[in-house]
Amino acid sequence: DLKIVPNDPTIIYATTATLFYKSIDSGANFTQVGAGLPTSAGRMAIAVTAADSNIVYALSVTSGNIFQGIYKSTDQGETFTAVNTTQTQIASIQAYYDMAITASPTNANEIYTGFLNIWKSVNGGVTMTQVNNWSSPSSASYSHADIHFLRFYGNKLYCGSDGGIYVTTNGGTNFTDLTKSMQIGQPYKIAISKQNSNKIISGLQDNGGHVFNGIRWQNFYGADGMDVGIDPTNSNLSYGFIQYGQSLYKSTT
């Protein structure tokens, strides 16, 4: 990961999987810093904030993709203190694939992490609370699973995920899917109603199950959409499995 300090672009932080570096000359030279960070990390991500140019956060997981901790520096990355090493549920088992952290530009203690879900803290990472609901597409707090990108632009927090780009203006209470109108996807399976040839459902890689009513596609479950089917005697009943057949979902519309 690499981050530039918003209020002082001469300061740049960079990480490898296990090492933390700092430049104070716009990237011409880097020095290893980060005392207090884990020495056996598998991946690290960085967050900086315009609210305080001295503060930098590091999010760390083990080589086995287990949550290692959230670490905070108040001296521009020279030393770090572990602020949260116990909330292991924050990280998914695929942190090698999806992992992100960001901080509010107006409140240095407000941070967000992303793995499978988005988590929020208002006390500098000491306690984290899940804000989104990836498995309920109709929920106001829904955003797709697998978070790769979290970043503030003004008062808007943007989230880049396997299912598109989402934005919240109220700290994660509500998310808006900015890519909702882009009807694109990678189907695993497709089923067509025997009663109504305009009724189609599809299970999509990374994007759950979708129903087409002849006019538009509507998502009715999340995760990875796999096998799907429509009741042969009732076109309003649609079914879909997620990855590995773990759960079966049903739509009645």
Give the positions of each predicted feature.
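Beta-propeller blade termini and top-face loops
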Residues: D1-T253
